[in-house]
Amino acid sequence: MRILNFILTRTVNVIPHEKLAAARKLVLQNCDFVVDIGANNGQWMSTVRNHGYNGKAICIEPLEKNYVKLKSVKFHNTVTMNCAVGNKNGYVYMNRASKDGESSSILELDDYHNIGAPDIKYIGKEKVRISKLSKILETNKHKKIFVKIDTQGYEFEVLKSINKSNFNDIYAFEIEANLVSTYKNSTLIEDLIKYLRGKGYQPLRIENGFGMPNFGQQLQVDILFVKK
């Protein structure tokens, strides 16, 4: 863990929220379409609109209760979609988490999550539709897409659902990444970075996310990637 922190802090900046927000705002000026995967109640999209982005967007949220709240917000120039995103088309069962469902995932909680947030529990399962991102973007005509992925350990399955044509059109990613296994069978940060570097993207900024400060352990970070 110390080695990984050493590498990260010397290749990209680990910075407070307002600085990542400033970087995101600059990147959005070069984008003509925003895809919000794991939109929850629309919190992140609200931030994007507050940045001054007025272009087209889609918010994607799988859980029905959260989707109803999301749809009621009625963001300007934004469509909504009630489904999960992953490397298959069909249906899956999703674990619904307590506290407004922000930790809900297709994957099971792992020990680090249970220790870091003992008040978060799964309270049921919900059958949801799942679609590849390539299918969602199959009629896309935009050439500078910003994709945000917050899928609680399922991020790599979303990335694998993107085809070559989509990658040509995607300018930036913002991804929640795990430094340790907070969800069972989740992909860790080093593999996400390696994969996206191989697709022609580089990390621009890293922001601290979920952690256990009393133990000195960071669990998750948000990473902003841009095309080289």
Model features per residue range: what roles?
Residues 1-228:
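Phosphate/nucleotide-binding beta-alpha loop and adjacent structural elements of enzyme active sites
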